[in-house]
Structure formats: C-alpha cells, structure tokens
Amino acid sequence: MIIKWTPSPNFTVGRKGKKIIAIVDHITAGFMPGCLNWLCNPKAQASAHYLVTRDGRIFQLVKDENTAWHAGMVNRPYWQLYDGTNPNYYTIGIEHEGFPNKDLTEAQYQASLSLHRLLIQRYDIPIDNEHIVGHYRIDSVRKANCPGPKFPWDRLFNDLRKGDEENVVRIKILFEGKELDGFIKDGKAYVEVRKLCEALGLKVYWNDKKKQVEVSK
C-alpha cells in the first residue's frame, strides 16, 4: 500500500492529550483534483487525515498524531463514544472521493479496506459500528448524507472481521496437565477466562449490571 504525503495546512498540532479511538468515514461530494485542492486550501478550514480516490490512490494530508478538521461540528449526534468534546481530537478522518449517491469503485474500496486495516492494527481500534462510523453519526443534520447510502458498510465490516479472524492462530495451552483452548494474535497468547479460572479452582461470575467479570475463591 502506497500512501502519498500531500500536506494540508488545515490542522491543529497534537490531540489535546486524547487517544485515537475511532475512524470517521466521509465522502467528498466532489471529484479529483478539486476535492484534494479544497482540503489543502487554507480558506476551506477543513481537512482529513486521508483521502482515498476513485482510482485507488491514498493521500495523507495530516499526520495521525495531529488533529485534522473533519468532524468538529456536532449536531444531534447518535454516537456512544462522543464524550462532549471535539471529536476531531480522538478520531482519524478518511475522505473518499465521490458523491453520496455513487458507489465506491472497486479500486477505491480495496484501498480504503487496506487503510482501515492499517489504522485498526496501529491504534488497536475495535471492529464495530461505534469505533468505525460515518460523519452523519456525529452531525446528523448537516452531514446526513456523509458518506451516504451507497457506502458499503456491511461489506467493509465483513471484510475487516474476516481479515481479523485470519490473523488468529488456534492453539492448545497445557496448564497443570489440563488442556485449554486458546489462540495467538499479534504475538500474544490468549485463553478463555472462565476455563483458566476453573482450572485454578476459582469461581467466575458475570455481573451484567456492571458489565464485568468477577472472580472469587
């Protein structure tokens, strides 16, 4: 995957101490080169970290560690991760060349899929519809069609999860003579909490109210 650095002046240095926790997908409502020029124009007062074009190219306009101006206006949001502060500080913005009523091209989709995978791995972003969202979830009034009805959400999540599963290696963990099922992902070994605790003679209880696992002797 080739990412071309094309700097935009429209950004804020740093992220106000916030951690990147989500990806926000956008549609440009315009074609190249106009959309790229606009995102790099100081008069626009707008930008994104990345732009994915219809021919499959990826441009990076703002460094990940800095704040791009892509989703700062909040209007009737329905997004669980919104914490009352500017979403730009804790999100990565990806623009897609095109219009809300047009499908992404296959080259564009594959490039966007690869970029999502890279960011998910880099920032440990969960693959779900709260951590990967459309702009409309943050501004449901002004940006109701961003990225629009043609954006391939189902396909994107299916492909991302498929790739996530392919990175998992199933293993057996031998614990004091007992064989436990586990798996390796990203160089780390995991085992089911309940099975491990039971092997240790501990009791496991799921507290649904607090949404936490409780372990006792």
Q: Where in this protein do the model-derived segments appear?
A:
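A mature extracytoplasmic/lumenal domain signature
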Residues: 27-29, 63-65, 98, 136, ...
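Basic/polar, cationic surfaces and motifs that engage anionic cell-wall
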Residues: 2-6, 13-17, 89, 97-167
